[in-house]
C-alpha cells in the first residue's frame, strides 16, 4: 500500500490537470514495535483530518477499534527436590496453568468475532521456580473492557489467596482506546470515503476493527483519523493481496 500511495503522490505532483486541495502524506513505521504514531508531529503535519491505510479486504471502512490492555503476570514458585517436596514445593508452572484455567474458554480469539472481546495469552515461560505470562485484553465496549481488566485482577488475587501473598504479581497497562467517540462528531469523513469507494466501483463495508490502528492514537491526539482498506488478507500470517485490487482506477 505504501508504494501505491507514493505512486499516487507522484501522479498528483506531475499532472497539474488534476485539481485538489492541500494533501498531507505521512508514513508511520512504528506501529508494529508498539509506538504507533507517537512521534508524528501533528501540528507540523498541518492537516485537520486524516485516514490511515491499514485495513484489510477491499471495501472495508473502519472507525471503531478495540480498547486494549496488556497484563504481565509473574508467578513466584518454590523449588525443592521432588523427593522431599510434600507441603513445601510451589510449582510456578502448575500455578500458571491454574491461573490460565480460570479464564473463559469462549472468550478467546479463535471463538470470537465482530464486537466480541477476548483474552489472549500469547506468552508463557515457566519453570518450577518462576513463570511469566502475558495476556492481551480486548473489547470494543468500554464497560466490558473494564470488567475484563477486573477479571484479571480477581484471578491473580485468588492465586495469592491460595498460595500466599506475592505469588502472583500483576502489571496491567492500557495500550489504546476505541476511537469511535472521536470520529462520531466528524462522520463526514465516513460518508466521503463511502462516496469515493462507490465512485471507484467498490462497495463500502463499515466494520469494527478487531485490533488497533495508528488512527486511534491520532484521533485522541486531535487528528480524527478513520481507517481505509488495503485490499490485503491474512495479516500476521501468510499475507496476500489481489493484483486487481491494486490496479483499480481512481
What are these regions (language model features)?
Residues 28, 54, 74-78, 138-140, ...:
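Solvent-exposed residues in well-ordered beta-strands and their adjoining turns
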Residues 37, 85-86, 238-241:
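Short acidic, glycine/proline-rich loop/turn micro-motifs
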Residues 57-60, 81, 234-236:
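Short gly/pro/ser/thr-enriched loop/turn and capping motifs at secondary-structure boundaries
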Residues 3-7, 244-250:
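Conserved small/polar residues in nucleotide/adenosyl-binding loops
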